[in-house]
Amino acid sequence: VIVGIEGSFRLKMGWVFPNHKDFMLCNFDAAKQLDMSKVDAFIQTNVLGAIKNNMKDQHDFMDNTGKPRIVVEQATFRKNIDFDKPETCYYKVGLNHFTYDEGIFYNKNSPSDRWEKIKKEQNIEIKPWRHMQYTGNEYILFLLQNPIDTSLNPLIESGIRYDDWINKTIRDIRSVTNKKIKIRLHPRFQSRFDLHTLSLLGVEISNEYDGWNKSNGGDSLYKDLKNAWACVTFSSNAATEAICEGVPVVNLHKSSFSWPVSYHTLDILAQDMIECNFDRIQWLYDCAYTQWTLEEINSGIVHRRLLDGNRT
């Protein structure tokens, strides 16, 4: 049996609990009474946050059992899907975590079939890499994240505030290039950023935020990407969409799913043209085997392949 605990599996946020017979949802008190010899794993949405940590008691309990954790998060490819439409949405499902560096997905060297299906369903086009000569009309697009999001755990746990990291990264970019910098705030959490401080750093702040939903930035992201010479981020999932658009990306943390097809230091920004030639093919195939529909999750194939450690 795979146990979900109300709270660490966040039903109130709109997550849908699997209806396969192997899954059981209960409250925390009931979970503590379970015979752990009959529990194979736990299922949760997201992970415990360095800031969002109000479910720490549940996560500590699950940790102490030593059981595997199936972690459900938003999909790797998010274009044209909507979290509020679960019947057509995809979800990333990993073992013990959801990030590129800590999650286990058994997806290395995956075949092409799943990518071909997702590409068609989500209408994703893989555009050639932009080898764009910088003329002064383009900009470095700095993709920001929700300041309290669990994707920033590695930064926050190291004792660095995200605001401070943003300011330092802008200064670090300035130390290697005088190219224009445009900031794209997280569309859902614009009010969580200190716009006054950002304005003092001489950067442009995007005003393109129309059309987003809980899964993606909508058309506004593509408007910002249109004249982007390159992107910089800690680990934003928008970098995945940028890479599909052919925009070179500097990812500054290895938790980002676009890490294998991106640069990892800012010095590349000193060039007038980035000759970006990462091969994205196998990366696309592998990413496709991290995300699943609710129908697939309910069929049992997803948890079986994770818990069995293979592609069953």
Predicted regions and their residues:
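Active-site donor-nucleotide binding/catalytic segment of nucleotide-sugar enzymes
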Residues: 130-190, 282-295
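Short loop/turn segments at strand-loop or loop-helix junctions that form parts
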Residues: 5-7, 45-47, 73-76, 137-151, ...
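Catalytic donor nucleotide-activated moiety binding site of glycosyltransferases and closely related
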Residues: 4-7, 166-215
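N-terminal pre-catalytic "stem/leader" segment of glycosyltransferase-like enzymes
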Residues: 1-49, 149, 309-312
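A donor-sugar binding/catalytic signature common to diverse glycosyltransferases
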Residues: 45-47, 53, 216-263
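Well-ordered, non-membrane alpha-helical segments in soluble/globular domains
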Residues: 10-29, 54-58, 158-172
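Leloir-type glycosyltransferase catalytic cores
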Residues: 86-137, 260-312
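Short, well-ordered secondary-structure micro-motifs within conserved domains or adaptor modules
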Residues: 33-73, 232-234
